[in-house]
Structures are given as structure tokens and as C-alpha cells.
């Protein structure tokens, strides 16, 4: 599996044998959603199984949830596997309060491979 930088320090993509993992970084708010939506739309249409990793996301608002729902629905509509990795208590609470557990199906990190070390993400800047 290799890490592909997509020109945005808030997004990293890994692909291997039909599985694509998207790691998001920072605050998943309207500003970030507008920046990463085009890339996620392409991946939701074209990638095999898609995992979105929110373990480096520090905040998520309604626009972030909307992006995730859109992505999950597009992936599943083509019969591909969808997975959302999330361990942030407030994001998990937001998903529950919005009644999106069945749509997004968040998985705890303990059931997934660990995230890439920060030094593996060239050009990543903390915000």
C-alpha cells in the first residue's frame, strides 16, 4: 500500500489491491468539505472498496456529515464496500444524534489497521 498526496495537506490516499483508504486531517467543516469534495467524489465513483479514516479529524460539522453520507451512498450504490473509521467522541455523538449510524456505520480504530505515522505524510501541516 502506498500513500498518494493529492495536493492538499488535509487529504491523503492509499490504494492497494482494490482497497482505497482516504485519510482526512484537521476540521471537517464547510471550508474543508469544499476543498476535498471533488477528490472524494471521484474516489466514491471509481475506487474499489473505500475506507474514510477520520482519526486525524478534530472537528466535524453538518457539512462534513453531508459529505460522508454522499460518499457512502455513492460507494454502496455501485455495490462496493464502505467503511468509516472514527474514534472522536464528538464526531461519533454527532453521527448518533443525526441518526446516521446505519448510513455511515462508523468503526472503532481497534478493528482496523493503525493510521500511517505522521512523518509518512509529506507536507502535512497541523492546523
Name each model-derived stretch:
Residues 1-60, 70-127:
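STAS-like cytosolic regulatory interaction modules
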Amino acid at each position: 500500500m502506498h500513500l498518494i498526496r493529492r495536493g492538499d495537506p488535509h487529504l491523503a490516499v492509499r490504494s492497494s489491491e482494490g482497497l482505497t483508504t482516504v485519510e482526512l486531517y484537521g476540521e471537517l467543516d464547510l471550508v474543508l468539505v469544499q476543498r476535498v469534495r471533488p477528490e472524494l467524489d471521484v474516489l466514491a465513483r471509481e475506487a474499489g472498496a473505500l475506507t474514510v479514516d477520520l482519526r486525524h479529524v478534530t472537528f466535524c460539522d453538518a457539512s462534513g456529515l453531508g459529505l460522508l453520507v454522499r460518499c457512502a451512498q455513492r460507494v454502496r450504490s455501485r455495490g462496493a464496500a464502505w467503511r468509516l473509521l472514527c474514534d472522536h467522541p464528538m464526531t461519533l455523538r454527532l453521527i448518533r444524534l443525526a441518526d446516521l449510524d446505519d448510513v455511515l456505520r462508523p468503526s472503532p480504530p481497534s478493528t482496523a489497521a493503525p493510521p500511517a505515522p505522521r512523518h509518512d505524510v509529506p507536507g502535512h501541516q497541523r492546523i
